[in-house]
Amino acid sequence: MTEYILLIISTALINNFVLVKFLGLCPFMGVSKKIETAIGMSLATMFVLTVASISAYLIDTYILTPLSATFLRTLVFILVIAVVVQFTEMVINKTSPTLYRLLGIFLPLITTNCAVLGVALLNINQAHTLTQSVIYGFGASLGFGLVLVLFAALRERLAAADVPHVFKGASIALITAGLMSLAFMGFTGLVR
């Protein structure tokens, strides 16, 4: 049990996919202007990352490896992620049309979110078990959601702040993301 908790902490805080591995930067910068949208995107990505981790593990273990077709991993994982995203999109459209409209183009873009594919491939490369794959995917999505919501809150405050004209928009957003990355470096010695 301790191993799984450490895996979640390590994935969410220490080896955060956005701030350390620089995966998932497109939705990080694109959906982080309002907290409501960031929360919705975080929840959608959390579901997709967790289900994609399970699916990728099962497909690799029971189909690709026995057939010696591991060279097809990336292509198959992209297809699996696309199916999971389409399912998620249908569920969000039925349950919350407002959130569906707010997420707009970024919801289908989860398919091409490199963090989702990165988690699936890293699970296989690190030889995780099914349970570890699920926890790794959940921890990665937890870290992604945490960073996305914190960044959205900071961007909302910056929108109301008196920022010099030169730094308005993407400039101050990138500076803020860099400072967040430095802050998350403080978690480095947390897990040994």
UniProtKB/Swiss-Prot annotation:
GO terms for cellular component: plasma membrane. The keyword Nucleotide-binding does not apply. Keywords: Cell inner membrane, Cell membrane, Electron transport, Membrane, Translocase, Transmembrane, Transmembrane helix, Transport. It is a multi-pass membrane protein. One of its GO terms (biological process) is electron transport chain. It is an enzyme of class 7 (translocase). The keyword S-adenosyl-L-methionine does not apply. The chain crosses the membrane at residues 5-25, 39-59, 63-83, 102-122, 134-154, 171-191. This is Ion-translocating oxidoreductase complex subunit A. It comes from Pasteurella multocida (strain Pm70). The lineage of its organism: Bacteria, Pseudomonadati, Pseudomonadota, Gammaproteobacteria, Pasteurellales. The gene is rnfA.
